[in-house]
């Protein structure tokens, strides 16, 4: 019997444990090295199959942008597979926008994985990865299913094992425009290439985030958030192009130092204690 619906489909966020800009291609895309680490801060998606071929998103929150990545993913898979089916899609959004946590990219990846199953397409992970790259540089990582060493513009993924850790993640109210950060004169674009063995020797303290200095110049709130975590956990770093920042909070069954209370944070800031994931919760949804 074919599936009629898929409910409570997770779309986990990620942290960039480091992010080095190692060059720039002739087409303007920046070349990166990073480790993407999955965390249990996640959106939740729901899908119901439609027979009329329509793709409809039913969110009661803010109006959806025309280029909504989730719908773009659904349309792309529908077109490339020539599938006559459609879907009603809704998202319980928990991962904040403009955070550098990959929330939108993860939603798109979970959409590809879910509709591949709901529509009975049986596409391989490799085919879905190729679609994901058309949607954005971070999407293939979430389709891939594992923590990864990431190179190129985000398309070269090497699965790696990461020790289970707790991460304190703090999202200030500001949204940092990615275009402004990559266009900043403060951005270093020639960081020396590293190796996985370099990272593995000291996974928590290795490297830096080349986007952090431009983001700090753009927003005092990023500076404040980094300082707040550093005072509590001893070190802090920004994820992606921001504005979320994070710090290691222990490796045991519970965090070594708890997350600060929401009442102690500036207005509209969001703090979350997150557990690192060893694999994506949908890792078995594609071959």
From Swiss-Prot:
It catalyses: 4-CDP-2-C-methyl-D-erythritol + ATP = 4-CDP-2-C-methyl-D-erythritol 2-phosphate + ADP + H(+). Pathway: Isoprenoid biosynthesis; isopentenyl diphosphate biosynthesis via DXP pathway; isopentenyl diphosphate from 1-deoxy-D-xylulose 5-phosphate: step 3/6. Gene3D superfamilies: 3.30.230.10, GHMP kinase, C-terminal domain. The keyword Kinase applies. ATP binds at residues 96-106. Its EC number is 2.7.1.148. Keywords: ATP-binding, Isoprene biosynthesis, Kinase, Nucleotide-binding, Transferase. Signal peptide: none annotated. GO terms for molecular function: 4-(cytidine 5'-diphospho)-2-C-methyl-D-erythritol kinase activity; ATP binding. InterPro entries: GHMP_kinase_C_dom, GHMP_kinase_C_sf, GHMP_kinase_N_dom, IspE, Ribosomal_Su5_D2-typ_SF, Ribsml_uS5_D2-typ_fold_subgr. GO terms for biological process: isopentenyl diphosphate biosynthetic process, methylerythritol 4-phosphate pathway; terpenoid biosynthetic process. The active site is at 14, 138. Pfam families: GHMP_kinases_C (PF08544), GHMP_kinases_N (PF00288). Belongs to the GHMP kinase family. IspE subfamily. Catalyzes the phosphorylation of the position 2 hydroxy group of 4-diphosphocytidyl-2C-methyl-D-erythritol. This is 4-diphosphocytidyl-2-C-methyl-D-erythritol kinase. It comes from Methylibium petroleiphilum (strain ATCC BAA-1232 / LMG 22953 / PM1).
């Amino acid at each position: 019997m074919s599936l009629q619906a898929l409910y409570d489909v997770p779309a986990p966020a990620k942290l960039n444990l480091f992010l080095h800009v190692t060059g720039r291609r002739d087409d303007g895309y920046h070349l990166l090295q990073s480790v993407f680490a999955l965390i249990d801060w996640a959106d939740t998606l729901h899908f119901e199959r439609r027979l009329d071929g329509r793709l409809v998103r039913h969110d009661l929150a803010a109006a959806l942008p025309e280029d909504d990545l989730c719908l773009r993913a659904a349309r792309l898979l529908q077109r490339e597979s020539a599938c006559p089916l459609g879907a009603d899609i809704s998202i319980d959004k928990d991962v904040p926008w403009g955070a550098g946590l990959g929330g939108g990219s993860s939603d798109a990846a979970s959409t590809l994985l879910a509709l591949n199953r709901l529509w009975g397409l049986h596409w391989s992970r490799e085919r879905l990865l190729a679609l994901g790259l058309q949607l954005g540089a971070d999407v293939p990582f979430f389709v891939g299913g594992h923590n990864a060493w990431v190179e190129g513009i985000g398309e070269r993924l090497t699965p790696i094992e990461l020790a289970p850790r707790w991460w304190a993640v703090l999202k200030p109210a500001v949204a940092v425009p990615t275009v402004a950060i990559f266009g900043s004169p403060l951005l270093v674009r020639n960081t020396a290439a590293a190796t996985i063995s370099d990272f593995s020797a000291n996974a928590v303290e290795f490297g830096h985030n080349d986007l952090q200095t431009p983001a700090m110049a753009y927003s005092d709130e990023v500076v404040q958030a980094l300082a707040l975590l550093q005072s509590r956990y001893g070190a802090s770093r920004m994820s992606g192009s921001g504005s979320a920042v994070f710090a290691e909070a222990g490796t045991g069954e519970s965090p070594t130092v708890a997350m600060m209370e929401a009442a102690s944070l500036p207005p509209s800031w969001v703090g979350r204690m997150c557990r690192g994931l060893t694999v994506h919760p949908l890792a078995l949804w594609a071959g």
